[in-house]
């Protein structure tokens, strides 16, 4: 695994100094670049992020329902939110990518950026402990936690579309995967969404079937509200 430059600067940006800098190097390494890649750290970081944000929301909103808590958590930990955080940290400048990913602009790809954030969380946990992770994450999420509120704004596009159609006494939307491209670890899904009030199917594209369905549902809602 090639050493990554300027890691002390990244540590200052993250707000954490690693005792074992190799953990941070691994967290920034995509599987296209090395066998010592970040996917196991990503798995660990995903779980840690979920418990820290769940705990924060549970105590911040003592009267919120389970559904509202789940929707707020989903908003805060989903891939596009993590990708925004990655861009705030300029993680793309530090990623270790293979030649193919580098050439195709992998340092800008939201799924790779989001995965790197989760991997860094996992690396901090291994380098320190859960409480250190908690303190760090609450700092990263301070503004987002302050701004988030329970309610309809946290419902995802598929839920909003379903509720809209049910309220109009219309049939539920139908989703169909029409194309899957890419390697197993980095696929792109194309999904069509059909509703009775639109003559043509609406297409959504995403790094997972769920994300593609959400994208399609959001576009259907926009068309129905015109």
Curated annotation (Swiss-Prot):
Please list which residues make up the signal peptide: none
What GO biological process terms does the UniProt entry carry, in alphabetical order? Answer: mRNA processing; regulation of gene expression; rRNA processing; tRNA processing
Q: Which InterPro entries match?
A: dsRBD_dom, RNase_III, RNase_III_dom, RNase_III_sf
Spell out the Pfam families in the cross-references. Answer: dsrm, Ribonucleas_3_3
Under catalytic activity, the entry for this protein gives: Endonucleolytic cleavage to 5'-phosphomonoester
Q: Which residues form the RNase III domain?
A: 7-129
What's a GO cellular component annotated to this UniProt protein?
cytoplasm
In short, the EC number is 3.1.26.3
Q: Look up the domain of life of the source.
A: Bacteria
Record keywords: Cytoplasm, Endonuclease, Hydrolase, Magnesium, Metal-binding, mRNA processing, Nuclease, RNA-binding, rRNA processing, rRNA-binding, tRNA processing
Q: Which cofactor does it need?
A: Mg(2+)
Active-site residues from the entry: 46, 118
Q: Where does Mg(2+) bind?
A: 42, 115, 118
The DRBM domain covers which part of the protein? 156-226
Q: Where in the cell is it found?
A: Cytoplasm
GO MF term set: double-stranded RNA binding; metal ion binding; ribonuclease III activity; rRNA binding
Q: What is its main location?
A: cytoplasm
HAMAP family under this entry?
RNase_III (MF_00104)
**Which family is annotated?**
Belongs to the ribonuclease III family.
Q: Main role?
A: Digests double-stranded RNA. Involved in the processing of primary rRNA transcript to yield the immediate precursors to the large and small rRNAs (23S and 16S). Processes some mRNAs, and tRNAs when they are encoded in the rRNA operon. Processes pre-crRNA and tracrRNA of type II CRISPR loci if present in the organism.
Indicate what this protein is called per its UniProt record.
Ribonuclease 3
As recorded in Swiss-Prot or TrEMBL, the protein's gene is named rnc
């Amino acid at each position: 695994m090639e050493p990554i430059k300027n890691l002390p600067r990244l540590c200052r940006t993250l707000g954490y100094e690693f005792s074992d800098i190799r953990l941070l190097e691994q967290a920034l390494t995509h599987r296209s670049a090395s066998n010592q890649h970040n996917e196991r750290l990503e798995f660990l970081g995903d779980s840690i992020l979920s418990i820290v944000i769940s705990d924060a929301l549970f105590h911040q909103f003592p009267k919120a329902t389970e559904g509202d808590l789940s929707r707020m958590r989903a908003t805060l930990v989903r891939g596009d939110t993590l990708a925004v955080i990655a861009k705030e940290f300029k993680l793309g400048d530090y990623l270790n990518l293979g030649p193919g990913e580098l050439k195709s602009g992998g340092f800008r790809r939201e799924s790779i950026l989001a995965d790197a954030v989760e991997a860094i969380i996992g690396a901090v946990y291994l380098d320190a402990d859960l409480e250190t992770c908690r303190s760090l994450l609450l700092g990263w999420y301070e503004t987002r936690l302050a701004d988030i509120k329970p309610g309809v704004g946290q419902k995802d596009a598929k839920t909003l579309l379903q509720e809209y159609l049910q309220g109009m006494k219309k049939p539920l939307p139908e989703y169909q995967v029409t194309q899957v491209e890419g390697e197993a670890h980095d696929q792109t899904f194309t999904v069509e969404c059909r509703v009775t009030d639109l003559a043509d199917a609406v297409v959504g594209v995403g790094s997972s079937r769920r994300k593609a369905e959400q994208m399609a549902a959001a576009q259907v809602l926009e068309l129905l509200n015109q």
